[in-house]
């Protein structure tokens, strides 16, 4: 029986509906955590088909989840962070904020344009999130939730239950509080101890960061007074603290005692706000010094710091410094951030390491005395640095840890300015004799070479001066009484020629003065003033003097255009013998004669270079502070030049001999 048209149409429609819905499963709303659990089941060995049937999603969808596993894990972490808020705050505003968070985490083209009314809660709840496992802090800024350390999280640097919820005040509250208290951050901590959990903290403690609003995408300060996420700040502080505790990173040995309980934000009490900030111990940061009647004093900020230092220098000279005055934490927080960026944390530790021994108050005389000596009197930090003092870079491993007494009697500004503004030790009553002697020795060690050349004629000749001027073409002939002969008379006549073969053998000593007289006339002010020097050292010094004269004559003979006529010098009675009975080394005079002549002998030049190398070895082992490294290098270059010149002259003499033989 044929089917009617209406019956056929109904059957066709039903068939189409059955075909359209066949194989379709009801859609299930699965969270990111459920998707991650399904992916983990696949990693554990289950097949994609069985997992897809179990959770009720197509297998192709499950394969897409596996491809986007990293994105799903990120969303799962965010949902885990918001789980506590979603369970405790099941209001419409909270649900709207969570929906807004999901929209913001999507692609840019799928984001909704939401009204400002949806953001009644803190903006950085949903926008700036960091995993809790990384820093152990939950500083998400909830309305009634304390920003502290949860029970099972990591306790970092002794930060037990610190409450930072007071930082979440708006700019209007801060300004109102500042007007009520007549000073910026005046009444912050009365109970001492330096514990932020017990103190009333405000944004004044980190006021330098309020100028960083251009770094954030937020429109104004109504959402966060810092214009930054508290999670970001906490993460950065924890990273800095972990670097401080790591002994392998730049040997930052002085920062282990710096606890995050102080959080770089110990509050400033009522007191003299114009006093210089000082790094104080936790047990001494309680009741501040100063009188309560100085509320008219301007606050100590970064901008007017120099004015306040100049204004209070006389007051600090008269009254001294209060050892119990805590540090101005606004500047201290800014300073620590600068030090962290520059890698200078080890120079400005707030407390010594617990394992470091207590060092005595008087600093031992080392080469770093000018930087490690702490000011014990009331010298203002803005004193003019001495010009002659040369700052030395102190290696981090050699910086001694500060004792509590040194920490109480020194301010962070002094340490900062001492490092970057040259050495500021004015030599006051606090500097003992050892530190003054070490400073003088250090200054003489780094003495300016140009200054030593300019003042050479005003001081007795020293080894440093003679070495520094060894490149000058001067033929120094020293007589028996220690007087330079031809320098005091008229200039030497270079036109006359003297034949070395016509000189009698007994006149060789005019080129080589006696070593004994040279020691008495020239080397006595140069050598160390210890009277118990051995005779062997004196003999070596005498030989070195003779070698230096030969080297000077060699240099002068090479730089002069013609043969050299030496000025006669009177013979001393002891010029033929040495102090210990040895004969005067006459080959040195022969060397000089052969060098001045055209027939240069290799033996004479080589012997002079050999003596010069011996003198160089002695000079490198010399511990005289007047001998600088630059002068030793100059002598090395001079000796090398003489050696090369002798080789060239020897090569020329051999060529002339070959030509004569041919």
Swiss-Prot record:
One of its GO terms (biological process) is regulation of DNA-templated transcription. Residues 527-536 have a biased composition (Acidic residues). Residues 511-520 have a biased composition (Polar residues). GO terms for cellular component: nucleus. Residues 349-391 have a biased composition (Low complexity). GO terms for molecular function: DNA binding; DNA-binding transcription factor activity. It is found in: Nucleus. Residues 48-68 bind DNA. Residues 21-72 form the HTH psq-type domain. Keywords: Developmental protein, DNA-binding, Nucleus, Phosphoprotein, Transcription, Transcription regulation. The keyword Nucleus applies. Pfam families: CENP-B_N. Residues 265-299, 348-407, 491-537, 558-596 are annotated as: Disordered. Gene3D superfamilies: Winged helix-like DNA-binding domain superfamily/Winged helix DNA-binding domain (1.10.10.10). The keyword Transcription regulation applies. Homomers. Interacts with itself, danr, ey and dac to form a complex (or complexes) containing the RD factors. Probable transcription factor with a role in the retinal determination (RD) network. Contributes to differentiation of antenna-specific characteristics. This is Protein distal antenna. It comes from Culex quinquefasciatus (Southern house mosquito).
